[in-house]
Design a protein with these regions (language model features):
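Amphipathic alpha-helical interaction surfaces in cytosolic regulatory modules
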Residues: 11-27, 35-50
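Short glycine-/aliphatic-rich beta-strand segments at the starts of folded cytosolic domains
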Residues: 1-7
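Electropositive phosphate-/nucleotide-binding environments in soluble metabolic enzymes
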Residues: 8-11, 61
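Intrinsically disordered regulatory regions flanking bHLH/HLH domains
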Residues: 3, 13, 23, 63-66
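C-terminal structural segments of small proteins and small subunits
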Residues: 49-77
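N-terminal intrinsically disordered, cationic/polar leader segments
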Residues: 4, 18-22, 29, 57, ...
Length: 77
């Protein structure tokens, strides 16, 4: 598992983020405070406070480098 911080501060970013990760057959969780939601759920993402950075847990072993490259626009360095 790999954890990165991401920013999803607009509706367009949320839609494109979900479209990107649904291409992968791995589990992705978003953690904000005490809430953990499925990152592939648009409704779940909108239940979080999107004004703050969110932790993304990526449960993937094989394609981790590829996934991180695709998610680069959302990752906070």
């Amino acid at each position: 598992m790999k954890t990165v911080q991401i920013s999803l501060n607009s509706i367009d970013k949320v839609k494109s983020f979900v479209n990107e990760i649904t291409k992968y057959d791995y589990d992705f969780d978003l953690v904000s405070g005490r809430y953990v939601i499925d990152a592939k759920s648009i409704m779940g993402i909108f239940s979080l406070d999107l004004s703050k950075p969110i932790d993304l847990n990526i449960h993937a072993d094989g394609a981790l480098d590829e996934i991180l490259a695709v998610l680069a626009p959302y990752i906070i360095k």
